[in-house]
Amino acid sequence: MRILLIGFEPFGGDAINSSQETVKAVACDELVGVDIMKEMLPVSFKMAGTEICRLIAESVPDIVIMLGQSGKSDFIKIERVALNLMDSSKEDNDGYIP
């Protein structure tokens, strides 16, 4: 089984992104028969979509797990519904606001 595990680079003035740190901390050699590919996406509305498509095409994973960080939450949440809206009141790391 191939798992693509994705985090994001820091943004919004933060020095670290908890999703990036979590992906880094996952031990890849402890699960027999499981190949975990760890990747980081840019916090860029223009680049992230292209990059995730490239990663999936190149690695052909069985499962894709994407982690994220929300400044609005102080605990872990599982997102049940992803709306995939390009909507934000804050700039991405390219200075772009959709």
Show the residue positions of the predicted features.
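N-terminal catalytic or cofactor-binding beta/alpha core of small enzyme domains
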Residues: 1-98
